[in-house]
């Protein structure tokens, strides 16, 4: 068995070689994240898509498109989702409005640069005046990207992709209206200006982030969630879980710097703030009451409705505050998938569902960050059901970690990274894949060295 020193030694050997890859050529970025002496920001912004929530609101989709004056509408989904009765309601509503939808049904669960390029090519081959995304986060993110690149037909794929993998070009072209209809209670993508994908050339998870990508409307219809299989409900629910915990424990917005020279340059992920905290607390309270029921009682409309609402609320929260280490560590986990094929997911290709990749490291992450903001860790644990009345602040990280672990055990989540096919020898590559995620890892309340990251992955090989 390898010890941590051996892992770090190998990781440093790999990182120190000559490498022109933009994702892997900045091995000291994270350890230097607090060295900036620039002026800190003193303001935060709150923005979100318009949200309409309620059972059956999908029936109103046709009217919404009519109100936009839309004539040519691209509907982005996948073949399996389009067969669901609740989704057919939305398609029928579009047709009743006198609009013939043009379907793109080749969405890949956990999109890649290749699957996104297919969607881009499809969108560019038409002249749509509106987009509709129906499905989980994969469908909504694919639709956002198709909308962006069909608006800027000369753009190369990496132009808008986040640095260091892409060029993070500012979005200045006007996008078409996009309406999102989420069918899972997880990503909150209907509220955010973020699209995430696997960049296969580097085996790395990355994304595109711009307020311009936000849907103009999210139709949050909990009837869609009744079709979620048990494992899908669990994995998606843990994405909500970590969105709320990470945004609530992110650095305060006043600790983020530098202050933007122009307010339009203020990043979407700004750090925890009083308004995002409201959404995070609401989501955690809802999770405490309804998460287990929503997974194990698929016909429980109340529980699944509440988790769908929690997904949206957490999305509003993290869409403005940000996420940090659980998500930063999750990207190489998903990008370096081996042969894991989860229950409840259609398609034969190996994937690690996003929510699963995120929660795998959550116990080790919150144990690591607990000392940096103990009061918030204890408050979160208390909301989630832990008895914190006589707890000491020094134990905050361990208490929240144990609380997360209990939820994972109750909902039968796989026992750590080893259950997904990873071992000690993979840790250098996992660390290396985390380094490009500084955009979000720098929002963690505690800075991380490469050795810290290796330790977090090592501790996450088993959870129970």
Swiss-Prot record:
Catalyzes the cofactor-independent reversible oxidation of gamma-hydroxybutyrate (GHB) to succinic semialdehyde (SSA) coupled to reduction of 2-ketoglutarate (2-KG) to D-2-hydroxyglutarate (D-2-HG). L-3-hydroxybutyrate (L-3-OHB) is also a substrate for HOT when using 2-KG as hydrogen acceptor, resulting in the formation of D-2-HG. The lineage of its organism: Eukaryota, Metazoa, Ecdysozoa, Arthropoda, Hexapoda. The keyword Mitochondrion applies. One of its GO terms (molecular function) is hydroxyacid-oxoacid transhydrogenase activity. GO terms for biological process: glutamate catabolic process via 2-hydroxyglutarate. PANTHER family: ALCOHOL DEHYDROGENASE (PTHR11496), HYDROXYACID-OXOACID TRANSHYDROGENASE, MITOCHONDRIAL (PTHR11496:SF83). One of its GO terms (cellular component) is mitochondrion. It is found in: Mitochondrion. This is Probable hydroxyacid-oxoacid transhydrogenase, mitochondrial. It is an enzyme of class 1 (oxidoreductase). Its EC number is 1.1.99.24. It catalyses: (S)-3-hydroxybutanoate + 2-oxoglutarate = (R)-2-hydroxyglutarate + acetoacetate; 4-hydroxybutanoate + 2-oxoglutarate = (R)-2-hydroxyglutarate + succinate semialdehyde. Belongs to the iron-containing alcohol dehydrogenase family. Hydroxyacid-oxoacid transhydrogenase subfamily. Keywords: Mitochondrion, Oxidoreductase, Transit peptide. Gene3D superfamilies: 3.40.50.1970, Dehydroquinate synthase-like - alpha domain. It comes from the Eukaryota. The keyword Isomerase does not apply. It comes from Anopheles gambiae (African malaria mosquito).
């Amino acid at each position: 068995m390898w010890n941590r020193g051996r892992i770090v030694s190998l990781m440093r050997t790999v990182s120190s070689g000559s490498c022109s890859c933009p994702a892997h050529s900045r091995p000291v970025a994270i350890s230097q994240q607090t060295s900036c002496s620039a002026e800190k920001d003193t303001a935060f912004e709150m923005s979100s898509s318009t949200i309409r929530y309620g059972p059956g609101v999908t029936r109103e989709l046709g009217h919404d498109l009519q109100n936009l004056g839309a004539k040519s509408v691209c509907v982005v989904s996948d073949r399996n989702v389009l067969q669901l009765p609740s989704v057919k309601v939305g398609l029928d509503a579009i047709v009743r409005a006198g609009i013939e939808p043009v379907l793109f049904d080749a969405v890949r669960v956990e999109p890649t640069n290749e699957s996104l390029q297919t969607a881009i090519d499809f969108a560019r081959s038409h002249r749509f005046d509106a987009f509709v995304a129906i499905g989980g986060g994969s469908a909504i993110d694919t639709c956002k990207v198709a909308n962006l690149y069909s608006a800027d037909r000369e753009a190369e794929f990496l132009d808008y992709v986040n640095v260091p993998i892409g060029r993070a070009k500012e979005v200045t072209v006007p996008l078409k209206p996009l309406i999102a209809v989420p069918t899972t209670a997880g990503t909150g993508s209907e509220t955010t200006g973020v699209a995430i994908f696997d960049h296969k050339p580097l085996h790395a998870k990355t994304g595109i982030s711009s307020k311009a990508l936000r849907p103009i409307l999210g139709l949050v219809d909990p009837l869609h969630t009744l079709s979620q299989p048990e494992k899908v409900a669990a994995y998606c629910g843990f994405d909500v879980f970590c969105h709320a915990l990470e945004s609530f424990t992110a650095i305060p917005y006043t600790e983020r710097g530098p202050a933007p020279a122009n307010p339009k340059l203020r990043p979407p992920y700004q750090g925890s703030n009083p308004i995002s905290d409201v959404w995070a607390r609401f989501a955690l309270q809802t999770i405490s009451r309804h998460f287990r029921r929503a997974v194990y009682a698929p016909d429980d409309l109340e529980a699944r409705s509440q988790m769908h609402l929690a997904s949206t609320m957490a999305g509003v929260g993290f869409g403005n505050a940000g996420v940090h280490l659980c998500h930063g560590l999750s990207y190489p986990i998903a990008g370096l998938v081996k042969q894991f094929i989860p229950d409840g997911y259609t398609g034969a290709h190996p994937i690690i569902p996003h929510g699963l990749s995120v929660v795998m490291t959550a116990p080790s992450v919150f144990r690591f960050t607990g000392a940096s903001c103990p009061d918030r860790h204890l408050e979160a644990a208390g909301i989630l059901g832990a008895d914190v009345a006589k707890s000491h602040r020094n134990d905050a990280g361990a208490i929240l970690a144990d609380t997360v672990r209990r939820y994972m055990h109750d909902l039968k989540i796989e026992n750590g990274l080893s259950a997904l096919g990873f071992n000690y020898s993979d840790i250098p590559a996992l660390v290396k894949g985390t380094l490009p995620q500084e955009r979000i890892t720098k929002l963690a309340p505690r800075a991380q060295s490469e050795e810290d990251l290796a330790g977090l992955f090592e501790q996450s090989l088993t959870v129970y």
